[in-house]
């Protein structure tokens, strides 16, 4: 039924929250701001790292030191983005099986494109060919705009009709809608199932290998 899968990264393929939270907490401590818990940080993930930092400090982007704070946060995260990050249980088995079935795959994330490429090379080298991160400076709007998904489909030589989008959040559901793709939401990510059930989706899956039943 589908020959292409577009994956979100954080909360879908990789459990990155501990490393993201550590970088947020580093910046908060360095500048004397209240320090958020991991669960508090988790609620703010999904719209890219800049918006995450906006939500994590007093005054957000209106803070006169915001650019410096964001630069320090980004540098710290880039250096420590793989300390505790890991693929969710069953993800590598799923990706390998999809590869075996000649399913085309891409990662589309609002995370900085350098971090996305780095994590793709560490965890999915030789398995996933296309990985796109936030690059609005190049005129490509971040999710939930359809731009990144359309770019990924173009690179893969795929069509919307034969492609499915897999993610774990409100942003992912809306991205799929905007891109004209069916959406599969995963319950092991950064949003609880009761939140996911209020969104637009084709199916919610609880284990990675359940995706195989959907794409057949």
Predicted feature residues:
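N-terminal helical cap/lid subdomain that shapes the substrate entry/recognition surface
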Residues: 2-93, 100-101, 114
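Substrate-recognition "cap/lid" segment bordering the active-site pocket of phosphatases
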Residues: 83-84, 113-164, 170-179, 193
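Phosphate- and divalent-cation-binding pockets in alpha/beta enzyme and binding domains
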Residues: 23, 52, 90, 115-118, ...
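Short secondary-structure boundary segments
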Residues: 110, 135, 187-189, 208
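Short acidic-hydrophobic, aromatic-tinged amphipathic segments that line or gate anion-handling sites
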Residues: 203-207
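Short, glycine/polar-rich helix-capping loops at beta-to-alpha or helix-loop-helix junctions
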Residues: 189-198
């Amino acid at each position: 039924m589908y020959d292409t899968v577009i994956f979100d990264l954080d909360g879908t393929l990789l459990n990155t929250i501990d490393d993201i939270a550590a970088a947020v907490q580093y910046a908060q401590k360095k500048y004397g701001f209240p320090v958020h818990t991991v669960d508090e940080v988790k609620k703010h993930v999904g719209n890219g790292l800049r918006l995450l930092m906006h939500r994590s400090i007093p005054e957000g982007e209106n803070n006169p030191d915001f650019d410096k704070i964001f630069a320090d946060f980004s540098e710290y995260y880039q250096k420590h983005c793989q300390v505790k990050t890991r693929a969710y249980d069953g993800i590598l088995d799923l990706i390998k099986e999809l590869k075996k079935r000649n399913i085309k795959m891409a990662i589309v994330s609002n995370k900085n494109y350098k971090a996305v490429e780095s994590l793709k090379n560490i965890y999915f080298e030789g398995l996933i060919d296309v990985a796109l991160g936030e690059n609005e400076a190049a005129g490509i709007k971040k999710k939930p705009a359809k731009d990144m998904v359309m770019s990924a489909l173009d690179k893969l030589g795929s069509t919307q009709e034969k492609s499915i989008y897999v993610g774990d959040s409100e942003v992912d559901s809306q991205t799929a809608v905007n891109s004209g793709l069916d959406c599969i939401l995963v319950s092991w990510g950064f949003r609880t199932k009761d939140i996911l059930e209020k969104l637009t989706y084709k199916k919610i899956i609880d284990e990675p290998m359940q995706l195989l039943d959907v794409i057949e």
